[in-house]
Amino acid sequence: MKNKSVIEEADDVRRAVEMVQLGARMQMLEVETRLSREKLLRIYKEVRGASPPKGMLPFSTDWFMTWQPNVHSSLFMNLYRYFTGPAGVHGLDAILKSYHLYLDHIETGVIEPALSLTRAWTLVRFFDADLLQMAACTRCGGEFVAHAHDPVHDYVCGLCNMPSRAGSARRKTTTRKAVAPTHKTTAASRKAVVA
C-alpha cells in the first residue's frame, strides 16, 4: 500500500461521505476514492446507519432511453457538460456538482428524481466509452441523451413527442391523494351536520 498524505486521505473521506449521503453504491466509492474497502464500509455504515446494498450496478444503456429517465439523464448531462466545459470542473467534482444542481432543479418542480448518483456516474462512464451521445431535437432544439452512432438528423425528443401513457402513474397517485382528503372532509362535515 502506498503512503498517502493525511490531507489526501481526509479529502477522500470527505468525498466518500458526500457520495454516501447522495446515495452512491459501494462500487462507485471504490472507484472514485483511494480508501480501503473496510474504511468505506465503516463510512457507509456510519453515514447511512446500515450496510450498503448488494448487487450489480446498472449496465444497460437502454434504461436511459425510456421516456422519463431520458428527460432526467438529459438534464443531468447538459449540466455536466456545462461544468466540464465553460466552468472548467472535471472528474468526480463535475459529477457531484452536476448532481447537486440536478437535485435542486428537480426539487423546485416537486418531482421525484429518476436519476440516482450511481446512475448519473454510470451515464458519464457510458459517454466516456462512446456508448451514448447527445442529440439535438429538431423541434425544440434541446439536447438529449441518445444511443451512440444512431442517426440523429431527424431526432425528436420525448418531450416534443410524448408517449401516450407518459405520467399516467403519477396522475393515478395524485388522484388517489386528492380523493382521500375530500372523503375525510365529507365524513367530518356529515358529523358536524348530525351534531
Curated annotation (Swiss-Prot):
Spans annotated as Disordered: 165-195
Subunit structure: Heterohexamer composed of two FlhC and four FlhD subunits. Each FlhC binds a FlhD dimer, forming a heterotrimer, and a hexamer assembles by dimerization of two heterotrimers.
Protein name, as recorded: Flagellar transcriptional regulator FlhC
Keyword NADP: no
Biological-process GO terms, alphabetical: bacterial-type flagellum organization; positive regulation of DNA-templated transcription; regulation of bacterial-type flagellum assembly
Gene Ontology cellular component list: cytoplasm
Gene Ontology molecular function terms on file: DNA binding; zinc ion binding
Co-factor requirement: Zn(2+)
Coiled-coil parts of chain: none
Free-text comment on the cofactor: Binds 1 zinc ion per subunit.
Taxonomic lineage from the root: Bacteria, Pseudomonadati, Pseudomonadota, Betaproteobacteria, Rhodocyclales
Keywords: Activator, Bacterial flagellum biogenesis, Cytoplasm, DNA-binding, Metal-binding, Transcription, Transcription regulation, Zinc
Lineage: superkingdom: Bacteria
Entry-linked Pfam families: FlhC
Localization of this protein: Cytoplasm
Keyword Ligase: no
Family: Belongs to the FlhC family.
Record-linked InterPro entries: FlhC
HAMAP family assigned: FhlC
Organism of this sequence: Thauera aminoaromatica
Stated role: Functions in complex with FlhD as a master transcriptional regulator that regulates transcription of several flagellar and non-flagellar operons by binding to their promoter region. Activates expression of class 2 flagellar genes, including fliA, which is a flagellum-specific sigma factor that turns on the class 3 genes. Also regulates genes whose products function in a variety of physiological pathways.
Residues where Zn(2+) binds: C137, C140, C157, C160
